[in-house]
Amino acid sequence: MTMFNKVVKEFQWGGHKVRMETGEIARQASGAVLLDMDDTVVLATVVGAKNPKPGQDFFPLTVDYLEKTYAAGKIPGGFFKREGRPSENETLTSRLIDRPLRPLFPEGFYNEVQVVIHVLSINPEVPADIPALVAASAALAVSGLPFNGPVGAARVGYKDGQYLLNPNRAQLAHSDLDLVVAGTERAVLMVESEAQQLSEEIMLGAVVYGHEQMQIAINAIHDLVRDGGKPEWDWQAAPKNEALVAKVSELGLADLQAAYQLRQKSARSQKLKEVYKSVAAKLAEAGVEADGVEVDNILFELESKIVRGQILNGEPRIDGRDTRTVRPIEIRSSVLPRAHGSSLFTRGETQALVVAALGTKSDEQIIDALQGEYRDRFMLHYNMPPFATGETGRVGSPKRREVGHGRLAKRALIPVLPPADEFGYTIRLVSEITESNGSSSMASVCGGSLALMDAGVPIKAHVAGVAMGLILEDNKFAVLTDILGDEDHLGDMDFKVAGTDAGITALQMDIKVQGITKEIMQVALAQAKEGRLHILGKMQAAMGGARTELSEHAPRMITVKINPEKIRDVIGKGGSTIQALTKETGCTIDIGEDGTITIASTSSEGMAEAKRRIEGITAEAEVGKIYNGTVLKLLDFGAIVNILPGKDGLLHISEIANERVNQVSDYVKEGQAVRVKLLSTDEKGRMRLSIKAAKAEEGDVPVAAPQAPGAGDAASQQQQQQQQ
């Protein structure tokens, strides 16, 4: 008799075998599911507070995705030998899981909910994000919490005209698409993707295909809940105070409508604050007892109805535009004099200062992932300080939102970057958001494309991004191009599309309601393309192509190819040679395992000197060639002469002059520069040199008579004895 009431469900999903179980591990959590997808094993747990905190006016959901190094059979680095702060991938995956789960909790549910997903085992070929999302959904479903799920998810690839379901890492490396889609049985809720300039039709097809295939996982979760789920919570939303709603509407509706006739964000925000304060004061004067949070929520609902109603009725949007118009755009390049590339991209009240810096291979980011260590030559960092929205706040390490926006912009630009063998620089872009009123991540894409071209990075084409919104009510809907911050909060869907004039490079969708059909998404994508092409036209007019010359402040780069066996000679004992080269020439020198040496410096003279010295260190001595040598040591039967760095040979006494030489020191001295010809090299690399042969070949003296038989053999024997 076991102490566990374990329920297990197994199913085949594409090329993967999946096993879900509940009832054995983490039984004190509200819900827990262990999911195994071809040896990638994740444990998802959910805990929900039984009661909300007093005064709580928002839904406090936290999602934490945590990777354990033991999952890959590793011990963490560093002094403490344990996992530290979340990596960028953990942060991004936490956001990926949060986004489709959050809209499925009922309105008015303010109990704290924490979802924690641990990666316990990793198959390097099976990414853990899809198993983690499905496991989190299953844990919520079995917990009994008020949750309108379950949610399914799928990764979709695209190659040779075919969609791939949950491709492994090897397949993803050659796929033209990496798209993650999540949703319920009836609707898509979230899309995250990177693409190689694909058409809207292919992208939409991938979303539909992924939604169809995720039903397998959703059905398995239903089976798990049926056999292993906990009782559903008896939770009901608090009834609306209709009398208070009517009173607040009476006091504030007209003023709110007037506020939304103000086109400038700062003036509108100020007016809205005044309305909120005024309504609270009037309620107090009238003797109406009301919770401030409840009043604010009613006013926000009124705002939403005003904005949505105006748009659906065909009236102008908040800032006076129609639904298809992009805000005015201003572009300026080479903004910063010492930066390698920079641009200032302004679209309405959203502005991004994007700066490019070029570095060498040693500047690449080394990422120690569960799947193994790898290097990243392209970084994009997004920062949005509080002053961008006219507020005060914390300034410091990036928050989840900043990390996510930076990754989206990076995804959009990766497909147009030149390969490393054509442009060997490490590239870092930093987007500093200096103003924000919606769509700052897409401003980062546009500004990033311009900054790359300004830096002389030969990208394939400009990339532009546009943020879209959608409002759906009954059978009416409106798609909004280039949404404002307020439209983002009040709409039913926001999606961001980035790409070139040839196709989409990145797509991100977040859908807050169910009922958005394939046809609606088709209209939205077509309108987004129209907006993207408009922005691309502005960017093309401002900068038609990448600069042909790098900034004078950017490092120049040359490459030298050497025999890989010579790498140790360039490095030297304990790194002494490479350190001396770097210090004396002022260059950065990177050595690849294949023998490719990259020399970078802002000084062309320093690069030339470093190249000359490396070629000297690695040069192979050629028989029959004449060299400038230096006498290192005198011997009774000749001298040791250095002809190349680390290359010494024997100048036999018989090869010094045509006449008989009795005393070597009568002809050469230690430290003397001499011209010598390499006569031969034996199987051990020992070299025979000749001054008289060099002079004869260069015309200084007649060609010497052939050497007597056996003389060469005697000299060779003497050289061997000396070097041994």
From Swiss-Prot:
Record EC number: 2.7.7.8
Regions of compositional bias (Low complexity) in chain numbering: 701-724
Region (Disordered): 697-724
Record-linked InterPro entries: ExoRNase_PH_dom1 (IPR001247), ExoRNase_PH_dom2 (IPR015847), ExoRNase_PH_dom2_sf (IPR036345), KH_dom (IPR004087), KH_dom_type_1 (IPR004088), KH_dom_type_1_sf (IPR036612), NA-bd_OB-fold (IPR012340), PNPase (IPR012162)
Top-level taxon of the source organism: Bacteria
Function: Involved in mRNA degradation. Catalyzes the phosphorolysis of single-stranded polyribonucleotides processively in the 3'- to 5'-direction.
NCBIfam families associated with the record: polynuc_phos, PRK11824.1
Name listed for the protein in its UniProt record: Polyribonucleotide nucleotidyltransferase
Gene name in the database record: pnp
